[in-house]
Amino acid sequence: VLGTSRYMAPEIMNKQVSPDIFTDAYSLAVILFELLRVGHPYVGDMVEDGTPEQQTQAYLGLYPYEDDPDTDVNRSSQMLPMDVVATNALRELFARTFIQGKDDRMMRTTAKEFALACLEASNRVMKCSNPECKCWFIAKANAKKQYVCPWCDNINDRPHFLQFKDRYYVSKIQKKENEVFSDKPVYSFVLRNEKNDITNNYISNMYIKRDKFSKPIDVYFTIRKAKDGKFYLINPGNNELYIRKNKTEKYMPVIKEADPVELERHDLIFFEDPQKYIKIDIDEHSRGVLFRYAVVM
């Protein structure tokens, strides 16, 4: 017995290979998909209403992925909607496994990638303020900038959160200074607890490398919510941390021994001194000169 057919990789069901880390990665993706959406990635309406043979064919990957952006022939009207229960990052990881990874085993999302994406997703949820609901949902504004609970349609107050961004630079040749080329949002973190520990996987991509430079996940800084509802920045590990208050140009280091720094919307938090990038020797062809920062929203 190699496993339950519903969770087995197609190449296992076809008896092409023995179980390995790639088939395990596929099975994990199916289980996570089922936990979130209450369904199988290849069992849409055209299979759900079909024969047992069609269901077996679906487990073999002979039907399109339910959330395939290029075709909607196998969509499900019975599963929980993807945009309600998963972040964009999780959606992309599922697509990698069930579209590209269906035939190319090397493309399948790893357990570590899923673990980090699930960690990030767990920090993006908020609790509905409707006392008759109190369900959790991914904090995401609609076109009217409202935070509507998908379970009861209650309009919730806008939460405080950190928006992490990556900033790219190119050089002004004549002034020997840098100008902003691109700001790309990467992660969000909802500040919902009395103590919000932000881990280093939000600060750097070093955690995903499979080499000697990999870093274990640990708390990088903390944001505490006081009884008066205000938020305060704390640097418990004395990591490199700077803040630029809204409507100011001054960068202030935040050190372990310092008093907590009150945070307001639009304050900027940096994880290295941003002023050092003004002095780098780059030219107009340079790309990838990058640092990450967070905006209090």
What are the functions of these language-model segments?
Residues E113-L119, N123-D211, D218:
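Regulatory extensions appended to serine/threonine kinase catalytic cores
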Residues V1-K15:
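Conserved activation segment of eukaryotic-like protein kinases, specifically the C-terminal portion
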Residues L233-G237:
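Asparagine-centered strand-capping/turn motif at beta-strand->loop junctions
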Residues M13-L28, F137-A139:
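Repeat-solenoid scaffold signature
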Residues D20-Y26, L32-R91:
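Conserved C-lobe activation region of Hanks-type protein kinase-like domains
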Residues A95-V125:
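Terminal C-lobe "cap" of eukaryotic-type protein kinase domains
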Residues R244-M297:
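C-terminal boundary/linker segments immediately following FHA domains
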Residues N239-Y242:
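Short, solvent-exposed loop/linker segments at beta-strand-coil boundaries, enriched for Pro/Gly
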